[in-house]
Amino acid sequence: MNIAMTERYKWLLFFLFILLTYFIPLETRLLWQPDEIRYAEISREMLVSGNWSVPYLLDIRYFEKPVLGYWINCIAQWLFGESHFAVRIVVVTSTLLTGWLIYKAAMVVWRNSALAFNAMTVFLSSFLVLAIGTYNILDPIVTLFVTAAMYSFLVALSTPNKKGKIIAYMGIGFFCALGFLTKGFIAVVLPALVFLVMAISQARFKEVVCYSSIALLALAITAGPWVITVALQAPDYWNYFFWVEHVQRFIAKESARSQPTWFYIPIVILGVLPWLGFLFGALKSAFSLKKGTLYFLLWFTLFFAFFSASKGKLLTYMLPCFVPLSILIAHYIEELKDRPDEKISKVNASINIAFGLMGISAVIYSLYSAKFALYDTNETLKIVLAISGFLFWSVIGAGALFRQTQFLTMFCSIGLSLVIGYAIPEKIESRSTPENIIQRYYEPLSNKSYLLTDEVGIGTSLAWGLKRTDIRLTETKGELAYGLNYPDVKNKYYSLEQLLALIEANQYKGVAIVLVRPDRKQILTKLTTLKEKPIVEKEGDLTLVFFN
């Protein structure tokens, strides 16, 4: 592929890449629990109940996030029905719009369409972005709003006239408010931190402080109505959301999400594939503070440092960091065009070849390892598809190596994107994507008066699959523990003793329990030694117990 042809067809090939990686796989992959189905079910319940102010999950108050993400998902479900496409189209659209803002931001600074195109391409083809940006969680949505706020500040700095600055600062406040309504204070605090440091470094502190009142006013007007409404309808919402979901998560050492400070370093290294060969050179170049890189460097380093300092860590928190990182990598790739040495490009291509081969080796090794076994012997098609996805990655890497073009690099992930929905091992599928199992047992599950489970994620999956919210919990309360403290939902949780009493009182009829790996607990033994024996069905990590 020569340079002229690449320029001529790059947009056509780019849209083909988007179609193959972001849209075609949407309906083919089952929804993952707990995250994807949780947000789908909250939106479904909101749409059915008409309560647009206070989020509920399984008819239990759920205060972990604000409402905007649920509202947007409600609209998608209203337009497209309760499908995988409807559930995921919001995050996909958010990710693609973030890519477009990356293009716009690069154009504001460098007025270089090739650099801007590369920045957008690097972002949308990065491994972590592809994984999170097509997965129904709130991070892609809040990343869009944070990116829009950061872009607005960039425009405010570069606009000479007062009217343009006022509009830009109104945009900052508006988009920070949308981010706040999606995921909370983080969408305001982190951009403000970057704005402050950038203003000081550019000797424009007075100007930024002066115009910030406009942003604060726009933020208050946008977010204020819901902030007041939820405080009136659920007076303890803000106490829980601020102290538990923000302060405790940031400082709690014993949190379930607690990870070491270096946790995100390997995530960035792996997540930036297939552009890893350019990562360290891009950061080194950015730290030299060449024209235009300071803002994006501050954006990346301050966000990264903040999330690394937090005790509670999740892989998805890194998504906003990949916006400025993609721009820095694209800037470095543009710098390399002026150098005759193609060593960095060859290193990057070689890394992609090696990654594909390592993936193939890992799949093959798992077939002969009892400890790391992924697939059963009857999953031949899944094994072939997994190997094919990694093989495609290596082949594209080899093409980039021998043809000496970076344009091919973005296509590395297409193979995995297309096959991943069909290549998930059954042992993972049974617990993490239980939709098929629920549909297989739809009739015996749906006709039960009492339906219980020992894991919230499975309960949410049952609610989504059966379109009923009267799912009850037993043994564990999980993320619904706070909501279960309300007196009007005391019948939503049963201890083991209460469950046994319920079954007996119901004359051993009309009760179904879905258990996750019950061999580690006493519950299955207790259930199977009752006076009347239940029907027990084993499906991977799930065990279904029926009292008919």
Swiss-Prot record:
According to its UniProt record, what is one Pfam family this protein matches?
A: PMT
Membrane topology for this entry?
Multi-pass membrane protein
Q: Does the entry feature the keyword Transmembrane, yes or no?
A: yes
- Species this protein is from: Proteus mirabilis (strain HI4320)
Q: What is this protein called?
A: Undecaprenyl phosphate-alpha-4-amino-4-deoxy-L-arabinose arabinosyl transferase 1
- Alphabetical list of NCBIfam families matching this protein: PRK13279.1
Annotated GO biological processes are: lipid A biosynthetic process; lipopolysaccharide biosynthetic process; protein O-linked glycosylation; response to iron(III) ion
Q: Which PANTHER family match?
A: MANNOSYLTRANSFERASE YKCB-RELATED, UNDECAPRENYL PHOSPHATE-ALPHA-4-AMINO-4-DEOXY-L-ARABINOSE ARABINOSYL TRANSFERASE
Family per record: Belongs to the glycosyltransferase 83 family.
